[in-house]
A protein has these predicted regions:
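Conserved acidic segment of CheY-like receiver
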Residues: 3-15, 20-24, 52
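Short hydrophobic/Thr-rich beta-strand motif most characteristic of the beta2 strand and flanking loop
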Residues: 28-35, 43
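Acidic catalytic/metal-coordinating carboxylates
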Residues: 35-36, 62-66
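Short amphipathic alpha-helix used as the core "switch/output" element in two-component signaling
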Residues: 42, 64-75
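Active-site residues of response regulator receiver
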Residues: 55
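Receiver (REC) domain active-site loop signature in two-component systems and cognate sites
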Residues: 58
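CheY-like receiver
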Residues: 120-141
Length: 141
């Protein structure tokens, strides 16, 4: 039986979601993709995911709002927000563990996702602690 990290990926753009899903699967993740944030939230109520990867700009519910709902259901699940913007207001990132803006290298995204699903790091209280741990991990490999 495989023991792969299960990622919920929510993006309203089917073309983008197919492309990134393919990349993430090549990197060893098991990806469940939803193009509707309402459907994704319903799935979260009955399924546990190791990590949620959310598009920021979606109709019906923003990625930051979906992040808040996911954290309410499963506070220990890391949430990564991706957006076409290089920065977002801090209020939009309140329930987000990492944010990647336009032009982020895919290897940076994948690396951060791998770090966040490590149980020890998922419990760290702030982004500076995660950054320190990521640096230590990179130095040890």
């Amino acid at each position: 039986m495989e023991n792969r990290t299960t990622v919920l990926y929510v993006d309203d753009n089917p073309k983008s979601s197919r492309l990134l899903t393919s990349v993430l699967e090549e990197c060893g993740f098991r990806v469940i993709t939803k193009n509707d944030p309402i459907e994704a939230l319903a799935l979260c109520q009955r399924t546990y995911f190791d990590l949620a990867l959310l598009d920021y700009e979606m109709p019906l519910m923003s990625g930051s709002r979906l992040a808040e709902e996911i954290k309410f259901l499963a506070p220990d699940v890391p949430v990564v927000l991706i957006s076409g913007r290089s920065s977002l207001p801090s209020a939009e990132l309140a329930f987000v563990d990492a944010h990647f803006g336009f032009g982020t290298a895919l290897d940076d995204l994948v690396w951060t996702m791998r770090i966040l699903v490590q149980p020890k790091l998922a419990r760290m209280p702030d982004h500076r602690a995660i950054q320190r741990a990521m640096t230590q991990w990179a130095d040890s490999t």
